[in-house]
Every structure is written in structure tokens, then in C-alpha cells.
Design a protein with these regions (language model features):
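Lectin-type carbohydrate-recognition ectodomains
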Residues: 1-130
Length: 130
């Protein structure tokens, strides 16, 4: 039997040279791997799920976005800045694809664990949730 999972929330990534790619179910990869492109921002449509987010942005540092509302932009648009590290709180797990390292292990969105790097000038290229 095939198990069909409903999306807990939707993600719309903003990628270097491509802009907004389009909303997709959170289980899909949001971003582009293998092409040396930075994930600059993303929007989450929470679909009733409570999600809190923090992001470490090139040249800015940590930004706390609190509880995410539909169309909250996490990151920057039009500034050419890379997302470097993310921290989420919610009922899901996530992983990120980091420049030169590939995919991290899955981690629970507990509001403490971070995925990515700080102080190494490495870009996050994609993110995935489950």
C-alpha cells in the first residue's frame, strides 16, 4: 500500500539567480543542490502548524522571526546574502544542505538545535522538512 502524507506546511524558497521558486510541500527539497547557489530566503505557509524560526544571515547575524505567519520572509531578498544557519521550533524534523558538506543529519525542531554553520562563510543551499 502507498502511504500518502499530507503536508504539515508549505515552503517557498528564494534562490540566488532564480528568485522565488514556488510553494511546495515541506517534505520536498526547498532550494537547489549541486549548482553552487545560495538559499537567500524562504517563506513558510504554516497551514495551522505553530512554527518558530531563527536564521543566521551573512553580514547580519542571528534574526529571530518568532512565530511564523503566512508569507513571513526568513532571510533577505535582493541583497545577495546567504542563509548560513537555521533554528526551528515545531512538531517536525529538518535538515539542510551546506556548501562543501552536503546534507546534515535530520534533527528535531526543538528551538535549540541549529543546522548549518556560523563564522565559516558557508551557504545553505537547500532545506527539507519531515
Amino acid at each position: 500500500a502507498i502511504e500518502i502524507m499530507a503536508a504539515k506546511f508549505l515552503v517557498n524558497p528564494h534562490v540566488q539567480d532564480y528568485g522565488w521558486i514556488g510553494e511546495k510541500a515541506c517534505q520536498n527539497v526547498a532550494g537547489i543542490t549541486g549548482h553552487n547557489l545560495r538559499l537567500e530566503a524562504f517563506k513558510i505557509n504554516p497551514l495551522g502548524t505553530e512554527i518558530k524560526a531563527k536564521a543566521h544571515i551573512q553580514g547580519i547575524g542571528w534574526e529571530d522571526y518568532g512565530v511564523i505567519k503566512k508569507d513571513t520572509i526568513i532571510g533577505t531578498v535582493g541583497e545577495g546574502k546567504r542563509l548560513e544557519c537555521l533554528c526551528f521550533e515545531g512538531d517536525f524534523e529538518y535538515r539542510v544542505h551546506v556548501q562543501n558538506s552536503g546534507w546534515t543529519d535530520w534533527t528535531k525542531a526543538d528551538g535549540v538545535a541549529t543546522m548549518g554553520t556560523v563564522g565559516q562563510a558557508l551557504r545553505i543551499e537547500a532545506i527539507q522538512f519531515r
